[in-house]
Every structure is written in C-alpha cells, then in structure tokens.
C-alpha cells in the first residue's frame, strides 16, 4: 500500500515524517538535516534552489530569495499585515488581478501556493529517496487559526506539488497526537502553546480513553496568524537599523543586501541569547557612502531583547485566556502544557507560559518535529495503520452569511467539532424579489463588513411573492479539513445553487492546472539537469585520468597515438561546454576506449602499481560516477555563488 507522508509546512522551517512499523519517524532531507528551511530562490541562470541551498545564497541574491511566504498565503494585498510585511522584506510583494498578495521575481508574478509547492516538492522528493518509492498522498498541517482561504490555498500548494492532500490538520492538534500517543499518560486536559516562525496558536485538548479508543478532542482553539519568530527577528533588525542610523546617519532599510545580512544576523543573535546573556552583531562593510565603507557593530543583551519583544509575548495572553474561557476551564484545570514552535525555546516565552498556566511547560516534546510527527500519525490513521485513535478537531472561527442591515448571522459557531453541517431558513427582504445573493463570512464581529469575506453566489428564479414569504434554505457543510461547502435552496421550486468556498480571491481551477503543469515541467528539467551534470562529472574524471596517464607515460606514447588521444580529449572538452548529454557520453566512451589501451601499457611497464591507480581513476569516472556527482556539483554551485 502506498505511503501517506505527514508534512509540517512551516513559515521558517518545514519537516516531513512517516509512520514505520507503527512508529513515527522524521525523514532527513538530502543534506542530512531533519528540518528544511522554507526558502525558495531563483538564480540568474534560471535554477530554482530550495531549502538550505537557497538560504546559503540569500545574502548575495536578496531580491530573488523568498522566505516566510506562509505569511502571505490566502491573504489580500491590501491587508494591513501584508502592507507591514512589504516594508520589511527584500523581495517584491505585488497585487494579483484578483486582489491577492503575490510575489514578483524576475518580472514573473507568482502565487504564494506556487512557492510553497516548491518546498513541498523537495520534502516529497526527500521522502521518496528514503522510502524508495513514489509518494502521492500527504497530510499537511496548518495553523489552527487559519481561515478557510488559507486552508484552501495550502491544499492548492499540495496539489501543485503533485500531492493528493488527504487531510489538512491543525498544528497544535498534530502536536497533541505526537505527545499523547503514549497511552500510559492516562486521561488529561492539555494546552498546546504553538509559537512558530510566523503564526501563534493555542489549543485546549482533552485526551481520553473512550470505548477502547484513544480520543483527542479539541475543546477550543485561538490564535494570531501574523505573530511569530519572524516578528521577533524584525524587532532586532529595527533596533540595529536605528542604532546604525544614530551612529552613521544612514538608513539601511533602502538596501536589500544589507537587510538580508541583518536578517541572518538577527536570527543568529536571537538563538544565541536563549543560552547566553549577551551577543555581538558584527557586520563589516554593511554599506558605504562618499566617505568610504561602513562597518556595523552592535552589542545586544538578553535583557534588551526581552524589552524589544515584550509586547509580542504579551499578545499571546489574550488568545490563551479566550481559549480557556471557550473550553469552560480555568488554568488550574490544565494537566500539562506542551510547547511547539522554535520561538518557544526563548526563556522569556517559557516564563510567560508558566505565568499564564501556573505550571512549568513540558520540555520533552521536540518543538521543531512534533507537528510533522503528529501529521504522520494522522496519515497512519487514514492509511489504516493506526486503528484506535479518534481525532475530533474544531473550526476556529464562526461562519455565517450577511443578512438585512449588513449584519452577520452565524450558522456555525467557533470551536464546533468538525466535520459538521448546519441549515437555516431565510427569506427575501423585498416584495417580488426574484434573486438573492448569499454572502459567506467568517469571523466573530457583529457586522458583516468587519469579518472575512469568503465568497458570494446567487440563487435566482425565485417566484415573485411578498417579502418574507419565500423560504430559502441555506446549508453550511464543513469537511474534516475545515474547508467549507455552502448551498442555498428555494424550498418552493427545489432550485438549488451551491459552491465550494474558494474565497472571493484564491486560485482558479485553470491557474492551479497551469501551476501543476509548470511544476511537472520543472521536475523534468531537474532530472535532465542532474543527468547532464552526472555526464559532465563522469567526463571530467575520464579527462583527468587520461591526462595523468599521458604525463606518466611521457615519450613512451607514439606521436600518432598522442595526437589521436589529444584530439579525443579536445572533442570531449568541447562537448562538456555544451548541454548535449548524449554527445558528452558518446565522446566520453570514445576517449575511455583510447585511454584504456594506455592504461594497460602503463600497468605492464610499471608492474601494476601506477596502472591500478589509473584504473581506479577510470572507475571513479565510470561506475562510481553517481557518487562523484553530488559532491562536485555542490562545490561548483557554491563557487558560483
């Protein structure tokens, strides 16, 4: 049976896991790391880099290196949080035709799901390399407080990456699965405090044994989808920029290269200050003016960092208190607090969590891997490998429609267990009204305009009648992914209209199909490029071995024979400069045949010693070619950077 992988698609880092023999296992990426930076870069020679390789070259390629894209997914360009982000990132955020926030690289506009799909494609490829088989299905996690548009956009990203997304689950719920699979813990009420790279979630979850099943019931959830480690980094960057402006009179905001260097240094400084009291940010040649180059040197203490981010940490208090209230619990009722997300490693955050819940948070759950592990467990449930687990998640925000006077009438309240269905009958607002517009909303405010608009559709051909007489039945149906379907039916005629909510923005079916095709083409280009590089590396090894043999034999090679070999060498070098893999392989074979005779002669003349050495070179260029490829290719790319 095909494997379903579990993916934590994070703002800063992503992680992939699988269930093996009933146990979850995090899969290392091709670089040997257990997490992959959620960074995608486009180079000058049209190469797409993902993960660590993209992060390494970010400083020299800031405008074409995309990070924290998850903060834009499913968002409108005019959103305040997007406008704030535009000022702080070195890449270009633009408004798409449908009003969504997209990015622009090299004159090409791209949707956030398209960029996230690149990260998913790498995770998929790494999982396939580990499993030795094709992966087609995945469970992907999202912040619990993601709205419908953001969930749909995440599902679109999976589809573009060639994955059938079997389930979208909430990150804190996944972390609870990872923590609570140890059945010896008994019945518990836990709080999952998830402060990641770009989002904050708090979920109150009850773990219990019910009729022999291990039941995970989400009692409530709350959060902030624009609060995370990236904001902590930005506070450090702003502080450094202000200090430098005071000292040098230069504003580094206008220099993308300087901003990228500052971002990297801010992240390192923040991490260092979790284990030390002071660090130094030292960036020589950060910029220059008419008087010459300028160097940046700023000392940052843990106390100063805590002062800079205090209000960000305090912003998590409100959602925590609301989640407890919605669950009908007090902090004393919570048995354990689980920390998820890299930002929870900050001592001040841990102190704050202890203050809110009155207990030490647990440190035995890996904050970087727990979510992916939970996703893998849910994948095991869907795949039938895990049989005694029941997961009851909730919808994070209320759902309803706009009614007379611009009011939002709720059909499904927040924290309702999903999947769920709700039906309500409405009528017309005017006499002889023959059509109604159903405006679908998500949020907690009273007025429609203050909530998130998910979409609109019309129900027409209603028979003329006085106002209030027609009966229009509106049904909201939320699936297990938290994605909404809405239908409206005229009870008199039976006429029905329905939509799967794709937001008033979002990607159209045609756009998704185009992006899927682009991704497939890109994968084919990757394969061809890999084969070409393998052929070049093999050829390079044969050239090296042949030159060495010629040098060692010296004047023992006849002029005619040397001329033939040198001609073959030059032909191969010419081919290596081009992109014709078949030609390179053909000329490599020709040179190998000619140089093989030389190797035999050298072996005979020198008693086998030098000959065996030469022979080993040929093997390096032959059957071992694939081993040579990655190492040499990586070095070349590093040099290019």
Swiss-Prot record:
Biased composition (Acidic residues): 627-641
UniProt cross-references to Gene3D superfamilies, sorted A to Z: 1.20.1270.10, 3.30.420.40, Actin, Chain A, domain 4 (3.90.640.10), Substrate Binding Domain Of DNAk, Chain A, domain 1 (2.60.34.10)
Segments for region (Disordered): 603-641
Induction profile: By stress conditions e.g. heat shock.
Pfam families in the record: HSP70 (PF00012)
Post-translational modification Phosphothreonine, affected residues: 199
Residue stretches of biased makeup (Polar residues): 603-613
Presence of keyword Nucleotide-binding: yes
Swiss-Prot/TrEMBL keywords: ATP-binding, Chaperone, Nucleotide-binding, Phosphoprotein, Stress response
UniProt-listed SUPFAM superfamilies: Actin-like ATPase domain, Heat shock protein 70kD (HSP70), C-terminal subdomain, Heat shock protein 70kD (HSP70), peptide-binding domain
InterPro entries listed in its UniProt record: ATPase_NBD, Chaperone_DnaK, Heat_shock_70_CS, HSP70_C_sf, HSP70_peptide-bd_sf, Hsp_70_fam
Gene Ontology MF term list: ATP binding; ATP-dependent protein folding chaperone; unfolded protein binding
Function description: Acts as a chaperone.
Family according to the record: Belongs to the heat shock protein 70 family.
UniProt cross-references to NCBIfam families, sorted A to Z: PRK00290.1 (NF001413), PRK05183.1 (NF003520), prok_dnaK (TIGR02350)
Protein name, UniProt field: Chaperone protein DnaK
């Amino acid at each position: 049976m095909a494997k379903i992988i579990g993916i934590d698609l994070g703002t800063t880092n992503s992680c992939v896991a699988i269930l093996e023999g009933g146990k979850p296992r995090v899969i290392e990426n091709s670089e040997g790391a257990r997490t992959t930076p959620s960074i995608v870069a486009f180079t000058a020679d049209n190469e797409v880099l993902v993960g660590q390789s993209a992060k390494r070259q970010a400083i020299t390629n800031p405008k074409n290196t995309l990070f924290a894209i998850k903060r834009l997914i499913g968002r409108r360009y005019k959103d305040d949080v997007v406008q704030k982000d535009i000022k702080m990132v070195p890449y270009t955020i633009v408004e798409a035709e449908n009003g969504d926030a997209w990015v622009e690289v090299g004159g090409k506009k791209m949707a956030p799901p398209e960029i996230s799909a690149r990260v998913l494609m790498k995770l998929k490829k790494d999982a396939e390399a580990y499993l030795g088989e094709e992966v087609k299905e995945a469970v992907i996690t999202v912040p619990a407080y993601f709205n419908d548009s953001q969930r749909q956009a995440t599902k679109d990203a999976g589809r573009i990456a060639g994955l059938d997304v079997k389930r979208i689950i909430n990150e804190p719920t996944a972390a609870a699965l990872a923590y609570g699979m140890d059945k010896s813990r008994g019945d518990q009420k836990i709080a999952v405090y998830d402060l990641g790279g770009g989002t904050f979630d708090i979920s109150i979850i009850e773990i219990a044994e019910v009729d022999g099943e291990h039941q995970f019931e989400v009692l409530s959830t709350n959060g902030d989808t624009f609060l995370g480690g990236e904001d902590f980094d930005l506070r450090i960057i702003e502080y450094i920029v202000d200090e430098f402006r005071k000292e040098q009179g230069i504003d580094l905001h206008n220099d993308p290269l300087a901003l990228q260097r500052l971002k990297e240094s801010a992240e390192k400084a923040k991490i260092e200050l979790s284990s030390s009291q002071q660090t130094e940010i030292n960036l020589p040649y950060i910029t220059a003016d008419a008087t010459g180059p300028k160097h940046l040197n700023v000392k940052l203490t843990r106390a100063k960092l805590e002062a800079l981010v205090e209000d960000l940490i305090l912003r998590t208090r409100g959602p925590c208190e609301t989640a407890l209230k919605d669950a009908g619990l007090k902090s004393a009722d919570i048995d354990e607090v689980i920390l998820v997300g890299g930002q929870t490693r900050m001592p001040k955050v841990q102190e704050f969590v202890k203050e809110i819940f009155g207990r030490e948070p647990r440190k035995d759950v890996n904050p970087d891997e727990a979510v992916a592990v939970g996703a893998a467990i849910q994948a095991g449930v869907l795949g039938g490998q895990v049989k005694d687990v029941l997961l009851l998640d909730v919808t994070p925000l209320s759902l309803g429609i706009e009614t007379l006077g611009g009011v939002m009438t709720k059909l499904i309240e927040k924290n309702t267990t999903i999947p769920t269905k709700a039906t309500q009958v409405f009528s017309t607002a005017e006499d002889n009204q023959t059509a109604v517009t159903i405006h679908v909303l998500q949020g907690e405010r009273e007025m429609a305009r203050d909530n998130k608009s998910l979409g609109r559709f019309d129900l027409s051909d209603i028979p003329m009648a006085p106002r209030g007489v027609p009966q229009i039945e509106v049904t909201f149906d939320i699936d297990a992914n938290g994605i909404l379907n809405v239908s409206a039916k005229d009870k008199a005629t039976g006429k029905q209209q329905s939509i799967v909510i794709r937001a008033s923005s979002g990607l159209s079916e045609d756009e998704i199909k185009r992006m899927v095709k682009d991704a497939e083409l890109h994968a084919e280009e990757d394969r061809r490029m890999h084969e070409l590089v393998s052929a070049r590396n093999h050829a390079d090894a044969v050239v090296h071995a042949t030159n060495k043999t010629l040098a060692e034999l010296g004047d023992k090679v006849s002029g005619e024979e040397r001329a033939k070999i040198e001609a073959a060498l030059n032909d191969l070098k010419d081919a290596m400069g081009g992109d014709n893999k078949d030609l390179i392989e053909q000329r490599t074979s020709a040179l190998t045949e000619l140089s093989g005779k030389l190797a035999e002669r050298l072996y005979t003349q020198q008693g086998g010693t030098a000959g065996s050495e030469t022979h080993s070179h040929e093997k390096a260029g032959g059957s071992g070619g694939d081993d040579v490829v990655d190492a040499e290719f990586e070095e070349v790319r590093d040099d290019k950077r």
